[in-house]
């Protein structure tokens, strides 16, 4: 089969329902098509011993495309490992309809055949790049496909923050924390904090306070090209945590500063040509149909 994709990575959630049958069907199709297959170590037990396996770093270096079988979390985990190498992803959904994994197991082979033949919609989504600064020096950094969260780390105490956008003061707040979200993350934690849903390819960032003390402190959408700077206000009982997609920065101090901006490169998701984000929203959120 003529294709720009010659080496296909297979990544799956080993304990997901229907995972074995779905991966077996995809594996058989790829073998018949004469394509190279590289199976991620975590699901290697679901394949014949002769299958070629590799770690995520090896997949990132060698694969032309990754087929991810599972849910949104499985795809996001793969994206974090692969996006720096420019490996596009295709999501096969097991279980409930996902925002990111949109191909059903019953259609997996047909849809995958079309995508590998070039009949697809490519979608670029930018993560966030965050760094923790102390005395002007970077002491920790990370990336977030969904969100960067600054919070007190305690269910019983609030945190006091000052936020600036491109060096211009935005506001100060007392709250349980602040979510800085990508469009991808706008349907995740930020949504539960009252944030808006952003179209996935929109060049924008959401700032959503978590349970603000001042009720007029509402979520705000800013340019995706803006630099968000967060500082802590003096507090005798200071404690804070900063996390990128639930991966925490260590030892956050009261004089530290957090800088968050759009990452330099996107990750790519390949969808079937009939992909419809609004249909997914209607289904997931139980919106009315016509």
From Swiss-Prot:
Keyword list, A-Z? ATP-binding, Cytoplasm, Kinase, NAD, NADP, Nucleotide-binding, Transferase
Q: Where primarily located? A: cytoplasm
Q: Does the keyword Cytoplasm apply?
A: yes
Quote the EC number: 2.7.1.23
Q: Which amino acids does the record list as binding NAD(+)?
A: 72-73, 146-147, 174, 176, 187-192
- Subcellular location per the Swiss-Prot or TrEMBL entry: Cytoplasm
Give the GO molecular function terms. Answer: ATP binding; metal ion binding; NAD binding; NAD+ kinase activity
A Gene Ontology annotation in the biological process aspect, one of them, is: NAD metabolic process
Which reactions does this protein catalyse?
NAD(+) + ATP = ADP + NADP(+) + H(+)
Recorded hits in NCBIfam families, A to Z, give: PRK01231.1
Q: What protein family is recorded?
A: Belongs to the NAD kinase family.
The protein, known as: NAD kinase
Source organism of the structure: Methylococcus capsulatus (strain ATCC 33009 / NCIMB 11132 / Bath)
The protein's gene is named nadK
């Amino acid at each position: 089969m003529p294709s720009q994709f010659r080496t296909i990575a297979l990544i799956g959630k080993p304990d997901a329902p229907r995972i074995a049958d779905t991966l077996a069907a995809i594996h058989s199709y790829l073998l018949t098509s004469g394509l190279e297959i590289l199976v991620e170590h975590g699901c290697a037990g679901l394949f014949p011993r002769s299958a070629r396996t590799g770690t995520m770093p090896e997949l990132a270096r060698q694969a032309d495309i990754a087929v991810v079988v599972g849910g949104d979390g499985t795809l996001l985990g793969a994206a974090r490992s692969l996006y720096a190498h420019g490996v596009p992803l295709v999501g096969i959904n097991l279980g409930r309809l996902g925002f990111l994994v949109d191909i059903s197991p019953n259609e997996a082979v047909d849809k995958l055949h079309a995508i590998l033949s070039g009949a697809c919609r490519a979608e670029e989504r930018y993560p966030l790049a965050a760094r923790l600064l102390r005395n002007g020096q970077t002491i920790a950094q990370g990336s977030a496909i969904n969100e960067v969260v600054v919070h007190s780390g305690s269910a019983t105490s609030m945190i006091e923050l000052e936020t600036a956008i491109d060096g211009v003061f935005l506001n100060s707040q007392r709250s349980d924390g602040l979510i800085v979200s990508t469009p991808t993350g706008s349907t995740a934690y930020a949504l539960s904090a009252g944030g808006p849903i952003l179209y996935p390819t929109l060049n924008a960032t959401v700032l959503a306070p978590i349970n603000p003390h001042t009720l007029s402190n509402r979520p705000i959408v800013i340019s995706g090209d803006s630099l968000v700077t967060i500082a802590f206000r003096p507090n005798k009982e200071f404690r804070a945590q900063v996390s990128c997609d639930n991966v925490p920065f260590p030892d956050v101090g009261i004089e530290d500063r957090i800088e968050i901006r759009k990452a330099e490169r996107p990750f790519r998701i390949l969808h079937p040509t009939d992909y419809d984000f609004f249909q997914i929203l209607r289904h997931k959120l139980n919106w009315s149909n016509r």
